[in-house]
Structures are given as C-alpha cells and as structure tokens.
Amino acid sequence: MKKELLEWIISIAVAFVILFIVGKFIVTPYTIKGESMDPTLKDGERVAVNIIGYKTGGLEKGNVVVFHANKNDDYVKRVIGVPGDKVEYKNDTLYVNGKKQDEPYLNYNLKHKQGDYITGTFQVKDLPNANPKSNVIPKGKYLVLGDNREVSKDSRAFGLIDEDQIVGKVSFRFWPFSEFKYNFNPENTKN
C-alpha cells in the first residue's frame, strides 16, 4: 500500500514537472488584450503561444505572433513582411515583392470600415525608424499589422520589429472553448 501511494506521488510530481517545463519552455498561455486583431482574435480570448517552434520552423507571412512592444506590454499581430521582402500597400491592397496578395482575414473589417481605407497607402521606407532609401525589410526585422487596421497600433505606428522582440507564434485559441481554432494563416481564415 505504501509503495503504491509512493508511486502515485512520484507520478503526479513528474507530471507537474513536465507540465511546468512545457509551459515554461515550449508553449505559454496568453490573453488577448484589446481589439487590434478583431475579429480573428477578440479581447479576453486565450491562446497558446509556441515559444520555440517559430525559431526552428521560422516565421512566415500570415503567422500571428506575440512580441514585446516595450518593457511592460506584449502585442499580438500578424506578420505581413519578413526579411528580404519589399512590401507596399496601395489603397488597402498589399503587394509583396511586386505581387498582389490576398488578405482574407481583412474581409470583415473591409465590409465594416469607418473611413475610405483601413490600411491606406505606405511603403516600408515610410515606416518609423526605417531606412528612407529602401523598401526592403532588413535582416532580423519584421513588418506586423493588426487585423483590425482602423484601431491597431502596429508597424505603421512603431516601425518594423526586431526578431528578438518576438515571444512566439500563436498556435491555437483555447478559450472560449466554443471558439477553438488551431491555425491563423490566411488560407485557413474565414471572415
């Protein structure tokens, strides 16, 4: 009886250690704050952020990431441009390396926009702290925008983000459970 009880205690302790390691080093929960990613991610929803997977698999255009905006705040935004990309918006239309890109995650906000445009017109060189002579995203930098462009504070306001600011890639939404979703890339977006 004592041996069986000891085995249970050890098993439970090992399970807690494994959960701690997974939670600390692989996936961490994050609560969405604000409306900048609405309707893709809404205020108060909870997501799991993969903090090592993006380092091994890399970030791609369309990934949703959490990053340190400053010492006190983390933001969640969508990657629009990666190092080496030439990015330009013309009247709400995205062009990457000269090719028009679909952004299905903007459909809802385009239908319900308050003004003429939700994203507007800009090039990489127009962003804060950018090289005014180049439209190419430099190595180690990313262009990120919120899906709710009319309210989002994103690269248009603070410029390109450094790779070392990135906490991780959003893997799945787990709360509310009725809204569970595991892939936020454009080809899986229905708005």
UniProtKB/Swiss-Prot annotation:
Localization (cell): Cell membrane
PROSITE patterns: SPASE_I_1, SPASE_I_2, SPASE_I_3
Parts of the chain on the Cytoplasmic side: 1-7
Keyword line: Cell membrane, Hydrolase, Membrane, Protease, Transmembrane, Transmembrane helix
Cellular component, GO annotation: plasma membrane
Pfam name, any one: Peptidase_S26
One MF term in the entry's GO annotations: serine-type endopeptidase activity
TM region(s), chain numbering: 8-28
Superkingdom of the organism of origin: Bacteria
Enzyme class, UniProt record, top EC level: hydrolase
Location, primary (coarse class): membrane
Family the UniProt entry places it in: Belongs to the peptidase S26 family.
Protein name as annotated: Signal peptidase IB
UniProt source species: Staphylococcus aureus (strain MRSA252)
Highest classification ranks of the organism: Bacteria, Bacillati, Bacillota, Bacilli, Bacillales
Name of the gene: spsB
